[in-house]
Amino acid sequence: MPMYKHLQQDASRPPVTLATLQRMKADGEKIACLTCYDASFAMLLDAADVDVVLVGDTLGMVIQGHDTTVPVSMDHMVYHSAAVVRGLSRAFLIGDMPFMSYPTKELALTNAVRLMQEGGAQMVKLESGGKQTEIVEFLAGHDIAVCAHLGLKPQSVHKTGGFRVQGREREAAARLLDESQRLEAAGADIVLLECVPSELGKAITKALHVPVIGIGAGPDVDGQILVLYDMLDITSGRKPRFVRNFMEDAHDNLEALKGYVRAVKQREYPAPEHCF
């Protein structure tokens, strides 16, 4: 029996679905999301009532020790997604499409299907915008749920010059707003915004009908997500401005996770000091 099996939610409890997330946006209920990479932590996230779990390619940095997410492969993502899904009974599971796993429509479809069939993901996430909009439309046309990632895109850090806030200038903000609307029209079911000014996060959330999840995107998006190891203060070194250490006032991991969910739901996180 897995170490935390006794903490897992009652399987009879209704699972979170895409329809649940759409209703939460309509009702103004904040969506609490976290990354996860293994079954034991997945059970803890479920016990803490985390709504959405993302098996992120951030595993390349926090699990594998790389400086970027670029080295992560499709095999890595399938392996970790399959591990996470075994620990979940309630949360909605999104799987990340790693670097160069979707350069063409056909390869994107092959890898998305693999992430769902072998990895158990209910939705796939792509770093989007520009030519990727056509890929989002192609996947959506094959009944695959898609999360479109805009703003700071970690897979592109070598091209963009590092990890920095996006959309500060008026033209850049207008371009991101336009891209978000194009992605929604193409069939994206969720938009994830990373490292953008709070006002831009608010504007995009207001403009879209689909849920908008933010990481460093201000308090007015529909939901928040953090890297699990950051908010539990497991990672060492300097952390991004938007990270809050939820272990600081907790006795154990589960208490910290519940504190995060509560802070998101009650609109206590992110605070002004976490925003751009």
Residue ranges and their predicted role:
Residues 2-276:
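Alpha/beta enzyme core
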